Amino acid sequence: MLNIFNLVCICIHSVLYSSSFFSAKLPEAYAFLNPIVDIMPVIPLLFFLLAFVWQAAVSFR
């Protein structure tokens, strides 16, 4: 469990302090997709939270 936590911390650290992460832009033809692209990194976290809600619904069998 500690290794997973360390991996998550490393990933968050690399995202927050990566200069190329904030300077990347979509081409003009796809500029209308910017709001969707901004939300996309959160989607895996929603699935992770859904797993806990599902387990709570079935009483953590």
UniProtKB/Swiss-Prot annotation:
Propiece residues: 1-24
Single GO cellular component term: photosystem II reaction center
Keywords per UniProt: Chloroplast, Membrane, Photosynthesis, Photosystem II, Plastid, Reaction center, Thylakoid, Transmembrane, Transmembrane helix
Membrane-crossing residue ranges in chain numbering: 36-56
Subcellular location: Plastid, Chloroplast thylakoid membrane
Keyword Translocase listed: no
InterPro entries: PSII_PsbK, PSII_PsbK_sf
UniProt topology in membrane: Single-pass membrane protein
PANTHER family referenced in this protein's UniProt entry, alphabetically: PHOTOSYSTEM II REACTION CENTER PROTEIN K (PTHR35325:SF1), PTHR35325
Function: One of the components of the core complex of photosystem II (PSII). PSII is a light-driven water:plastoquinone oxidoreductase that uses light energy to abstract electrons from H(2)O, generating O(2) and a proton gradient subsequently used for ATP formation. It consists of a core antenna complex that captures photons, and an electron transfer chain that converts photonic excitation into a charge separation.
Summary of subunit composition and partner proteins: PSII is composed of 1 copy each of membrane proteins PsbA, PsbB, PsbC, PsbD, PsbE, PsbF, PsbH, PsbI, PsbJ, PsbK, PsbL, PsbM, PsbT, PsbX, PsbY, PsbZ, Psb30/Ycf12, at least 3 peripheral proteins of the oxygen-evolving complex and a large number of cofactors. It forms dimeric complexes.
Protein name: Photosystem II reaction center protein K
Annotated source species: Glycine max (Soybean)
Lineage: Eukaryota, Viridiplantae, Streptophyta, Embryophyta, Tracheophyta
